[in-house]
Each structure stands twice: as structure tokens, then as C-alpha cells.
Amino acid sequence: MKRFLHLLLLLALVPSLLALPPRLRAERPGPVVLLLDAEALREEAQSQGKSLLEVLESYRPLGVRGVAFPERLVKDWVGQGELLYRSGRELLEAGLPAKPNWYYLRGNRELLELLQAAYDLPHEWVGPWLGFPLDVQAFPAFYPLEEVRAAKEAGFFVAVRPINQRYRRLDASLPIVPKEADAVVFAGLEALGYPYRLEEAQERVPVPVALIEGTPQPGLAAYREKGILRLFSLRYEWQLTLTPEEAADKYVLAARERGHQLLYLRPYPYRQDTEHLLRRIQEGLEASHIPLGHPVVREFTPSPLRLAAWVGVVSGLGLLALGLSVYGPGVAFLLLLLALGYAGSQAGALLAALVFPVLGFLGPRNGLWMWLRTLGYALAGTVFLSALGSTPETILGLQAFKGVSLTLLVPPLLVALSFLDRNYKETLTRLFLHPLRLGEVALAGMALALLLLALLRRGNEAPLVPDLELKLRSLLQDLMVRP
């Protein structure tokens, strides 16, 4: 029976390997664009008495080919001097027939007319003042459209960041996504139109949307037909704790190892640091042969051959059932139920990750050959996992792999179970009566500490990162291995 299962496993490897090239082509890095945040750059422009476009042009030789415009709030226009903002009580005391519990705006007439149509709220004009019954200072209020046009005419890749707000109107006449935009990067923690107006909002977005690494945005999957571009950014507070070299290495790693196409940057307080950051990114991208340019939406059609990997996974599950001397079939059946119930459509990939690292330990424990056998099974499991995990959702980053914690816990438990023989009660009794030694306790404690560290480090934002791990990551990165 074992020979038959091994034969099936080997036969399943061939179509599974043939199913991988489409995924490799779809995940090929580049082209990428360096996007500077327009509002973060504005302080530098104002301090030098220059326009935003002039400062952008000064960064073009350093690889910057794009600019992102976050949508402004009403209070941003007030702070810039384009609008005046007064409560109704103030206007009433000034002799105007305003409503005391309303709020009023005055200033740029073109902008006021846009705001009049922007919100699903009652409004009124009191002379030159536009009034609303709610305090609209934190309401979305479009973009500096002249700067958007100028950046586009200068050849920059333009991204806009609309804000989702329950009172905003999604009207085609409003510049929610200006026609100059090349991509949309939703601001905040949810996509435009979420939760009840996604269908209407999709009509306002004619360009690809960005998937921000590490920032789930409910409703984003509804825009899949528009095209998905993967974006990497560092939270600015965290960026300030990093040197330009450290930050640049993270951007290069994101483009090289995770296929990010939009690198979203905010300048450091000192221009010298920003220039150093950009130079380092350019050098890293060139060394990795990743071109700068206009990012394109990745198209991926899974190969039907990937389904053959299920034969390999089921064969591996059968080998596990036969290899465990205690409750082997029961354990294999429970793993199958766990994978189907927890991971759903990703059950095959999860089973490959849980089962194949263990198979090498189920045969004869003959030193080096056991480890070589274990390596072979693990590589086969990697092929099956990659084949079954090759779906458009995973390639685009819309669906994360389910079961990372299980892959850290279950294989060691299965290996421990493999050491029990059929007379497991006698083995457990002997283990219970075994006299403890200080060295054994120390080794067990070290093993538990390492397991705990692995669990803590499984996510993208872990609570602790030892210095030794950072040094190891840096070394692996220099050797072109993803840490």
C-alpha cells in the first residue's frame, strides 16, 4: 500500500510542477512606481516658496515617477485659507439671518458649489455663506484639482485617495476620482461605498485600486474587476524610527519578494534623509533588476493541472495514516476534517503544509538519510501547497493563507506522536516515571521558548523582534533569500 501511495505522490508531482509557471510569471516583480504623498510634501514646498510640482520635479532624478493625493477635509481648506468657517450663532450675532445650530462656509465659489452637491444633507445660502445642519469640518472635500492636472501633464503617475463617508453623495458630476487619476488608494480603513453602496461606488472608480499591505479594507474585493495593484507603505511614525537605509531595504524587499507595484513614500523631516532613502531604493531595485515604470494589473488564470496536487495531498495523508503506530487513520481523518472545516477552499494547501513535513520522520530513523528523506517530502509538500494555493485571490493578495498557527503547532505534535509505539501506555508510564535532569529541563524550556517565539513572530506586526533575528534577516536579504 505504501508503494502505491508513493507512486501516486510522484505522479502527482509532475502536473503540479507544470501548474506553477503561470504563477511565477504573474508574480514576477515590476515594474514599480515610487509614489510621494502630496500632502506630506507640501510643507517642504511651502517652506521653500515653491509649488508642489517644482518639488516633485526635483525628486524625479531620484526615481520618483508618481504622486498620491489624499482627499482633503473641509478643515484642510479652511486651514489653507480657501474657506472661512463659522457657526450659525456667530453669523446671527453679526446680523445675518443664519440658523444658530447650523455651520457655515464662505470663500472659493467653485469649491463651495462642489460642496453644496457633495453631501446628502439639507443646505442653505445666507448671502455668500453656505450652511449645513452638521459640523462638516471632518467631511471629505475633494482634491486640489489644479495640482492634480499639473502633475498629470508633467508625466507623473497620479493616485488619489478618496474617503468613505456615509453622508457623501456618489454622484458622477463630482470629482471623487478625477479623470487624471491612474489609480485609487482608498484612505482610511474601508473601501469607498462600504458597506451598503459598493455597487454605486464602483461606477465612480474607472481605474485600478490598490491593496495596501497589512491594512485590511472591507469592501475592497468588490473592486476586483477594476484591477488590483499591490501597495507597500510604512506607517510614518514607524518610519521615523528607522534609518533611511533600513526603510529603503524594506521597500526593496517588498518589491522583490512580495511583488508590490506601488511604493508609497513620505519624506523624512530632513531632505538629505529623503534623498538618501530614494537613492538606496533605486540602487536596490537596480540590483534586483526590477524596472521603474507604469505598473500594470497582473492577470492570472490558474492552470487546471493544479488540481492533480490533491492526489499528492491525499496520498500524503494516507502515508501519515499508515506511518503513525497509534491511531494513525483516526488522526489523518481528524486532520482532513479540520482542514475542510477551517480552511475551506484552502484545505488542500493547509493539509500539504501540515502533513508533508512529518512524513520523513515516520520511516526508519537512520541518521542523515532520515533528514534527506524529510527534506524531500517537505519539498514535495511545498510544490503541492503552491499549486493548490495558486488562485487569483491569493496572487492578488485578496485572500491570505489560513492556518499559519496550525503549521507551527501541528507538525511538531505529529512528530512527537510518531515516537509512540502500539504499547503506548507502557511508553507513557515510562516517560512519567523518568527521573528529571537539569539539562533535560533546560532543553525542554528552550524548546518551549522557541515555539512561543515562533507563534509571536507569525504575523506581519509582531510584538517583539530580537536583535539577532534582525541581523539574520539582513544577512538572508543580502543573499537574495526572503527572510
Task: Identify the meaning behind each predicted range.
Residues 1-26:
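Hydrophobic alpha-helical transmembrane signal-anchor segments
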Residues 2-11, 307-483:
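Alpha-helical transmembrane segments of integral membrane proteins
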Residues 17-29, 456-464:
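Hydrophobic alpha-helical transmembrane segments in integral membrane proteins
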Residues 24-302:
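Soluble extramembrane regions of membrane proteins in the secretory/endomembrane system
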